[in-house]
């Protein structure tokens, strides 16, 4: 995908199917009456059959080990449970690129570990993962490249994972911001 591809309005549908965004605040992403309906919403918009939708919902619930939440109201869940449901709602769409905005904010250590393990699984499965985070230590095992941005939102420095690991002064400055 490049700028020319994105300029063509007919390509918008393709982009929506290929890229999934998980918001920092899960409350703004969740709006259905049950977790099952939340997970079914995206695939339903793609025009999939109910059989395929149910299969995706059940597979994703199992992948994230949240089958017990299936009939719960999303707004009544804990912060960590909401984050998993928000991620699951995107995974049911099976995008090739996943954008995570501050995936660890406000989560207990238990849910932070669960999210890290999930990100590692998704990476192993071949998904492209882009993470905006101030918690580098938690994502160090996942990332292949680190981009540092200025206050003007421009890239100031780009490191490969190996370069990043060889610059402890930059890591220290970044992880103490």
Predicted region positions:
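Conserved ABC ATPase "signature" region
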Residues: 51-69
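Conserved ABC ATPase signature
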Residues: 73-77, 81
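Catalytic Walker B motif of ABC-type/P-loop ATPase nucleotide-binding domains
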Residues: 98-101
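H-loop/switch region of ABC-family ATPase nucleotide-binding domains
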Residues: 133-134
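Conserved beta-strand-loop-alpha-helix hinge in the C-terminal portion
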Residues: 153-175
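Hydrophobic anchor residue at the start of the ABC signature
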Residues: 87
């Amino acid at each position: 995908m490049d700028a020319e591809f994105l300029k063509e309005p007919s390509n918008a549908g393709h982009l929506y199917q290929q890229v999934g965004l998980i918001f920092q605040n899960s409350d703004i992403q969740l709006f259905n009456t049950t977790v099952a309906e939340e997970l079914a919403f995206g695939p339903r918009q793609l025009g999939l059959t109910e059989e395929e939708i149910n299969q995706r919902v059940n597979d994703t619930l199992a992948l994230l080990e949240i089958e017990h939440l299936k009939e719960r109201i999303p707004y009544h869940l804990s912060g960590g449970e909401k984050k998993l449901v928000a991620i699951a709602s995107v995974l049911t769409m099976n995008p090739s690129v996943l954008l995570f905005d501050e995936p660890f904010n406000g989560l207990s250590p238990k849910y932070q570990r669960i999210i890290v393990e999930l990100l590692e699984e998704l990476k192993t499965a071949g998904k492209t993962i882009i993470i905006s985070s101030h918690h580098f230590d938690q994502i160090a095992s996942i990332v292949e490249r680190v981009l540092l941005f200025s206050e003007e939102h421009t890239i100031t420095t780009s490191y490969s994972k190996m370069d990043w690991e060889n610059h402890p002064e930059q890591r220290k400055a970044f992880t103490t911001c």
